[in-house]
Curated annotation (Swiss-Prot):
Domain of life: Eukaryota
Annotated organism of origin: Drosophila melanogaster (Fruit fly)
Post-translational modification: Ubiquitinated and degraded by HtrA2 in apoptotic cells; proteolytic cleavage at specific sites in the BIR domain linker region generating inactive fragments. Mutation of one site reduces but does not abolish cleavage as another site is selected by the protease.
Cited CDD domains: BIR (cd00022), RING-HC_IAPs (cd16510)
Pfam families: BIR (PF00653), zf-C3HC4_3 (PF13920)
Functional description taken from the UniProt entry: Anti-apoptotic protein which functions as a caspase regulator, using its E3 ubiquitin-protein ligase activity to smother caspase activity. Binds, ubiquitinates and inactivates initiator caspase Dronc, and effector caspases Drice and Dcp-1. Acts as a Nedd8-E3 ubiquitin-protein ligase for Drice. Suppresses apoptosis by targeting the apoptosome for ubiquitination and inactivation. Plays an important role in cell motility. Overexpression suppresses rpr and hid-dependent cell death in the eye.
Site residues by UniProt (Cleavage): 162-163, 165-166
Descriptive protein name: Death-associated inhibitor of apoptosis 1
Description of how the protein assembles with itself and partners: Interacts (via BIR 2 domain) with Dronc (via residues 114-125). Rpr, hid and grim can outcompete Dronc for binding Diap1 therefore removing Diap1-mediated ubiquitination. Interacts (via BIR 2 domain) with HtrA2; this displaces any bound Dronc. Interacts with Strica. The N-terminally cleaved form interacts with Ubr3 (via UBR-type zinc finger); the interaction promotes the recruitment and uniquitination of substrate capases such as Dronc.
Consequence when changing residue 162 to D: Destroys cleavage site
Enzyme Commission identifier(s): 2.3.2.27
Keyword Transferase: yes
Residue spans of the BIR repeats: 44-110, 226-293
Family: Belongs to the IAP family.
């Protein structure tokens, strides 16, 4: 199996005829050639020319070049011009496209996104690229053809439910099964925050564009991917007990100042970490309305954290300390709105003929009727996830979220928090609900 190469220059060296001449003119000539070639690597023909001394006869260099790779002339390492991944240590059974997809599943070329790629044969390229079923998230609207109200077999036709009982009624309904912890409406959270709360460094969570548009965008979409957040912790203080991977997993990226971190989703900031502070707990304690926390951990976890006497006392003490940011009057008003009861939440948008309690009952009955059995456990004790239930973005976890209003259930919680459009229908969503299968 091939392996990915990390911490290498952004472009591998291009082979030149070695001339023992250190004059400025010669160096300038080489630099100009190198720059020209790098600028042309969006062309398959140029990429193919870099394989003149490719050492592996059994690995198709044409297919490598066809799918965005060029030869770095360092061992058997190749690099994709479009996603930047470097792959080396190829083995006999390795194939270009599967290995490329394995190490860089979000490559825009493999996902059929719009790029400046210039193929030699566009039809040949189309034949070897992963099919649309493996490329749902990044497919162009023009290449994605499906029925407007289509949904995967066995999943909940949420759009039909929403049309009948209204969006807020669905939000008020909570979780999808009676055995799971209830999930609240995911709304705009407004908090001053920190482990103690960060003064001046925190902006309340707001949705971009305005709430009138109905569409959700994380505050820092560039850090929606966990690996992007992890890269910000290079200068993280090493004496702190909280490790970068723990903070990144909990949705935080490092601001580069002291021990201050921010949540990519709600924009809240935490600082002054104590040795016993656990990132997820602090996130849930101070930023309880954060949609990322709700998706990943659930409302029951948030309520449990808030109920812990020690944490509750710490939060109360921190809020009373001078110099700590406190939510403004406007924030308090919005916070009150987010904690409205189900009856208040649905009073404006639901048809008068459907009472909130009735909507909840209808929703639960539909969910119970369409619930899918829990995946079986094999003899080794590990749970095998059927392929049809895999997240259609990462293909590594079971899908467990529903995008609203389209109702498509195709992504795991972590991936759902990193996109702004439904991966299936490519339409912006206004909300995401955690789904529990019994």
């Amino acid at each position: 199996m091939a392996s990915v190469v990390a911490d290498l220059p952004s472009y591998g060296p291009i082979a030149f005829d070695q001339v023992d001449n250190n004059t400025n003119a010669t160096q300038l000539f080489k630099n100009n050639i190198n720059k020209t070639r790098m600028n042309d690597l969006n062309r398959e023909e140029t990429r193919l020319k870099t394989f003149t001394d490719w050492p592996l006869d059994w690995l198709d260099k044409r297919q490598l070049a066809q799918t965005g790779m060029y030869f770095t002339h360092a061992g058997d390492k190749v690099k994709c011009f479009f996603c930047g991944v470097e792959i080396g240590c190829w083995e006999q059974e390795d194939q270009p496209v599967p290995e490329h997809q394995r190490w860089s599943p979000n490559c825009p070329l493999l996902r059929r996104r719009t790029t400046n790629n210039v193929p030699i044969n566009a039809e040949a390229l189309d034949r070897i690229l992963p099919p649309i079923s493996y490329d749902i998230c990044g497919a162009n609207d023009s290449t994605l053809e499906m029925r407007e109200h289509a949904y995967a077999e066995g999943v909940i036709p949420m759009s039909q439910l929403i049309q009948s009982i209204g969006m807020n009624a669905v939000n008020a309904a909570g979780s999808v099964t009676g055995t799971a912890a209830p999930q609240p409406r995911v709304t705009v959270a407004t908090h001053a925050s920190t482990a103690t709360q960060a003064t001046g460094d925190v902006q309340p969570e707001t949705c971009r564009p305005s709430a009138a548009s109905g569409n959700y965008f994380p505050q820092y979409p560039e850090y929606a991917i966990e690996t992007a957040r992890l890269r910000t912790f290079e200068a993280w203080p090493r004496n702190l007990k909280q490790k970068p991977h723990q903070l990144a997993e909990a949705g935080f990226f490092y601001t580069g100042v002291g021990d201050r971190v921010r949540c990519f989703s709600c924009g809240g900031g935490l600082m002054d970490w104590n040795d016993n502070d656990e990132p997820w707990e602090q996130h849930a304690l101070w930023l309880s309305q954060c949609r990322f926390v709700k998706l990943m951990k659930g409302q029951l976890y948030i309520d449990t954290v808030a109920a812990k006497p020690v944490l509750a006392e710490e939060k109360e003490e921190s809020s009373s300390i001078g110099g700590v940011a406190v939510a403004s009057t406007q924030a308090s008003e919005e916070e009150q709105q987010t904690s409205l009861s189900s009856e208040e939440a649905v009073s404006g948008d639901v048809a008068p003929s459907v009472a909130p309690t009735a909507a909840t009952r209808i929703f639960n009955k539909i969910v119970e009727a369409t619930a899918v059995a829990t995946p079986s456990t094999n003899s080794s004790g590990s749970t095998s996830i059927p392929e049809e239930k895999l997240c259609k973005i990462c293909y590594g976890a079971e899908y467990n979220t529903a995008f609203l209003p389209c109702g498509h259930v195709v992504a795991c919680a972590k991936c759902a928090s990193s996109v702004t459009k439904c991966p299936l229908c490519r339409k912006p969503f206004t909300d995401v609900m955690r789904v529990y299968f019994s």
